[in-house]
């Protein structure tokens, strides 16, 4: 999550949705017709589909995440909605709490059968993909900023504006609380290393194990960290910084790469695929793809002012980006 947090709150809005069935369909992202080529760089970025995922205004927040099996894409936003899409951009279902509150982030369970959302009202809510609420977590005194599922029924972890990181069992019993300086903003979990990475707005990354033990604190000079992503093997961490850089760290905390993405503005989101290609989105509205040597391989400017989130499909060839006003764009690396 990468965010200028909002001070407003959506109150009194009631939304109901039709009970459509969730169809587990194989995504057609690999076979989708190519709309257009957007550059002539070493990596081509082909637009598959662009659509209005959410209707957002002002300093909005939008996040996108693919499911582990690659069949679905989850979008969450400060309009108070989470939306489940097929991987080729067809809407399956909308989720809204009661009362509706802005959603700062979300995540799929490892098996893709549930999602969890992080609410401005301090509530983390767990849903099945049919839209039923399975439970609510009410342990924070301020906004929930991010949420992750752990593996093998180990529970979930939440982070918050109140500076705490909290672990919860599958029956929503508290397992641990870790307090860190500042706001804990963004998280990622890697099943290979069994580690949780949590960013703080003072430029630190806290590495935890599922028992809540702090394994390492990595200090950066990026200022507020807007996003963090593990490499697939869990050996590398990529961060998006307030200072306009993306950085790559190993688990010992050593910085192995600094990418100067832009001179004036934030890097708002990062993602890394299994080939260690790094995608960045930023305040200047440009998606860029880099290698681990820091070389720019390709870029795409959708002319949407600011981009807020990026996610690689598990196949490593497709990716999705989201703009602050709610547009979602699906692309393929060529």
Curated annotation (Swiss-Prot):
Bilayer-crossing regions: none
Alphabetically ordered keywords of this record: Repeat, WD repeat
Gene3D superfamilies, per the entry: YVTN repeat-like/Quinoprotein amine dehydrogenase
PANTHER family given in the database record: TRANSCRIPTION INITIATION FACTOR TFIID, TRANSCRIPTION INITIATION FACTOR TFIID SUBUNIT 5
Listed name of the protein: Uncharacterized WD repeat-containing protein slr1410
InterPro entries membership: WD40/YVTN_repeat-like_dom_sf, WD40_repeat_CS, WD40_repeat_dom_sf, WD40_rpt
WD repeat residues: 56-86, 98-128, 139-169, 220-250, 262-291
Domain of life: Bacteria
Taxonomic classification: Bacteria, Bacillati, Cyanobacteriota, Cyanophyceae, Synechococcales
GO cellular component: outer membrane-bounded periplasmic space
Native species: Synechocystis sp. (strain ATCC 27184 / PCC 6803 / Kazusa)
Pfam families: WD40
UniProt cross-references to PROSITE patterns, sorted A to Z: WD_REPEATS_1 (PS00678), WD_REPEATS_2 (PS50082), WD_REPEATS_REGION (PS50294)
């Amino acid at each position: 999550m990468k965010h200028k947090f909002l001070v407003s709150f959506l109150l009194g809005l009631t939304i109901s949705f039709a009970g459509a069935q969730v169809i587990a369909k194989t995504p057609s992202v690999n076979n989708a017709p190519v709309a257009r080529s957007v550059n002539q760089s070493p990596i081509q970025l082909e637009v598959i589909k662009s659509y209005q995922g959410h209707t957002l205004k002002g300093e909005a927040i939008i996040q996108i995440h693919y499911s582990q099996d690659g069949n679905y894409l989850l979008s969450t936003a400060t309009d108070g909605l989470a939306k489940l899409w097929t991987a080729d951009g067809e809407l399956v279902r909308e989720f809204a709490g009661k009362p509706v509150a802005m959603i700062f982030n979300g995540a799929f369970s490892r098996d893709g059968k549930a999602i969890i959302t992080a609410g401005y009202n301090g509530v983390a809510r767990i849903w099945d993909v049919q839209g039923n609420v399975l439970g609510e977590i009410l342990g924070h005194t301020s906004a929930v900023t991010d949420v992750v599922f752990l593996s093998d029924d180990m529970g979930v972890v939440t982070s918050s504006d109140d500076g705490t990181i909290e672990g919860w069992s599958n029956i929503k019993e508290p397992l641990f609380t870790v307090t860190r300086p500042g706001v804990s903003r963004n998280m990622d979990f890697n099943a290979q290393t069994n580690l949780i990475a949590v960013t703080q707005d003072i430029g630190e990354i806290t590495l935890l194990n599922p028992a809540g033990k702090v394994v390492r604190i990595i200090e950066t000079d990026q200022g507020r960290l807007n996003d963090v992503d593990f490499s697939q093997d869990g050996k590398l961490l990529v961060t998006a910084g307030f200072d306009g850089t993306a950085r790559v760290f190993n688990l010992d905390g050593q910085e192995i790469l600094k990418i100067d993405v832009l001179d004036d503005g934030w890097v708002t989101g990062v993602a890394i695929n299994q080939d260690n290609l790094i995608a960045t989105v930023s305040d200047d509205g440009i998606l860029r793809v880099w290698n681990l040597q820091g070389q720019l391989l390709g870029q795409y400017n959708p002319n949407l002012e600011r981009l807020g989130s990026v996610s690689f499909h598990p196949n490593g060839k497709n990716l999705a980006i989201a703009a602050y006003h709610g547009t979602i764009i699906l692309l393929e690396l060529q």
